[in-house]
């Protein structure tokens, strides 16, 4: 190759690099636009379907308790491990069908009212009962003045008072049903306003635009400390507001709630989606984070709607 051709090739390469630089990097596409949305208003039970029969029974017992209008104690027919406990809690927190906005915290308690360390994940079946605290905004002031009292062996010494706190929420079946309908109405309204004949790719873009224009990332919740959770009942209820599908009412949420909103909208138009959770690095520290896994045009994509909400960019 002669000198002129080498110089010409160099110039063309440089021009190409400059074009890429000036135009910015190419945005990854979500789907190809081949499948139409179905507006089926169906959901999926991705997390629930992976539970074994014992875990499903406990999950259903918790749901039934809350739907009756209160929290309280559930005595387990057979002890479960923290591994099983975590699977149940994750289902009630993130499953598109079984996610329950009304649950704030579920306390694992063992023999002699010992609070089991939920962060030690193992197969030891030492959880004998669960205490369910519902998300009751009307009675949160009481939680500011209540503390679980633990002795040196992690035994809850004020268990009767704690059970009363769980059972005495200003909650009712009617309130649960009314707020559930109010939450559903928000999602229905968004879908009702969608242009007709959208394909899956366009629908996802539409939902992300809605999140960008309407949702606000709640930094105040993210920056507040919620650990140790048994000592921060009030803070955990506020945290729950921003991390379940009900956060659509106040248009404020954090990664969990925003991811649930996107997956909920997608499922209602026939796009299979569910929240997934892991960790990301922030200033060198690993922190929890949520995304959405979805099937668009027969391929799986992982979308971070929180990034859209925080930056206003896709």
Predicted regions and their residues:
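Intrinsically disordered, low-complexity N-terminal segments that are enriched in acidic
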Residues: 24-163
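Hydrophobic/aromatic-rich core segments of domains that either
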Residues: 256-314
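Hydrophobic alpha-helical membrane-insertion segments, chiefly the h-region
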Residues: 14-23
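Secondary-structure boundary elements
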Residues: 171-247
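A short, highly charged nucleic-acid-interacting micro-segment common to nuclease
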Residues: 244-258
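N-terminal Sec-pathway targeting helices
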Residues: 1-12
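Acidic/histidine-rich, surface-exposed loop or edge segments in extracytoplasmic proteins
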Residues: 39-44, 66-71, 163-173, 181-193
